[in-house]
């Protein structure tokens, strides 16, 4: 029996700026990573997005990033461990409040953009994030890629860890994500994305950008909500998985 979660980064609009196709994407995912106001999102959008997830029976997670609206949280910032820990606590707490007044709880936490990538390789940053999550709620699941500093930090503080892969991103031979600056970082071919995802779930391998096969662990598959093809990607990926005997469930039900 195969089972997997499908997640997407949503709630990234703010003020007069609309980003993503959240109202459509939520129909095909099982977990949502909601921006918490630092790299994107605002109080009105956070409230709307939590409501949207509850309406579509989608589990809710916090998506904390660096305080960098202009860079959409994709620029590396020089922040201390204490600063990062407090950034994450602040953002989890904000979303946690919107969930609590609606009678629900957060399922997971997934760092955003540069913070996610830095935590994959920097032990201090990863530990700051893990300690922040644990200090708020030890029942929260930490989301990240396998064989990373983030996985090791989550294990050290006793958090459950969900192994993530990306439907629309190429990977390097070491399993890390290809930089968005690379022309082939993003996978735009739906059929190719579906084949890659199915192979990752059923065989535990993924073809790297140089053609080598990389072993992967998969609990949750990310489809980026700010990608113009996000809706069609999410729909096709879910259909492909279900047609091939894979159950789609929120990560909290099996991690």
Curated annotation (Swiss-Prot):
This is 5-oxoprolinase subunit A. InterPro entries: Glyco_hydro/deAcase_b/a-brl (IPR011330), LamB/YcsF/PxpA-like (IPR005501). Catalyzes the cleavage of 5-oxoproline to form L-glutamate coupled to the hydrolysis of ATP to ADP and inorganic phosphate. Keywords: ATP-binding, Hydrolase, Nucleotide-binding. GO terms for biological process: carbohydrate metabolic process. Belongs to the LamB/PxpA family. Forms a complex composed of PxpA, PxpB and PxpC. Its EC number is 3.5.2.9. It comes from Caldanaerobacter subterraneus subsp. tengcongensis (strain DSM 15242 / JCM 11007 / NBRC 100824 / MB4). The gene is pxpA. It is an enzyme of class 3 (hydrolase). SUPFAM superfamilies: Glycoside hydrolase/deacetylase (SSF88713). It catalyses: 5-oxo-L-proline + ATP + 2 H2O = L-glutamate + ADP + phosphate + H(+). One of its GO terms (molecular function) is ATP binding. The keyword Hydrolase applies.
């Amino acid at each position: 029996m195969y089972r997997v979660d499908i997640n997407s980064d949503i709630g990234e609009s703010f003020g007069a700026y609309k980003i993503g196709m959240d109202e459509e994407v939520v129909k095909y995912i099982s977990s949502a990573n909601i921006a918490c106001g630092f790299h994107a999102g605002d109080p009105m959008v956070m409230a709307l997005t939590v409501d949207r997830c509850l309406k579509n029976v989608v589990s809710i997670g916090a998506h904390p990033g660096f305080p960098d609206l202009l860079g959409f949280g994709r620029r590396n910032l020089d922040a201390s461990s204490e600063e990062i820990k407090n950034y994450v606590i602040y953002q989890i707490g904000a979303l946690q409040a919107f969930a609590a007044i609606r009678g629900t709880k957060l399922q997971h936490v997934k760092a955003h953009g540069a913070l996610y990538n830095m935590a994959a390789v920097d032990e201090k940053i990863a530990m700051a994030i893990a300690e922040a999550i644990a200090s708020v709620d030890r029942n929260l699941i930490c989301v990240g890629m396998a064989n990373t500093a983030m996985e090791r930090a989550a294990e050290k503080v006793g958090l459950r860890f969900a192994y993530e892969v990306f439907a629309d991103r190429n990977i390097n031979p070491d399993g890390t994500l290809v930089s968005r600056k690379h022309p082939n970082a993003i996978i735009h071919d739906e059929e190719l994305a579906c084949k890659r995802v199915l192979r990752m779930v059923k065989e535990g391998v993924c073809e790297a950008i140089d053609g080598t096969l990389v072993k992967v662990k998969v609990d949750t598959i990310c489809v980026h909500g700010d990608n113009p093809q996000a809706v069609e990607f999410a729909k096709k990926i879910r259909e492909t998985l279900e047609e091939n005997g894979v159950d789609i469930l929120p990560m909290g039900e099996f991690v």
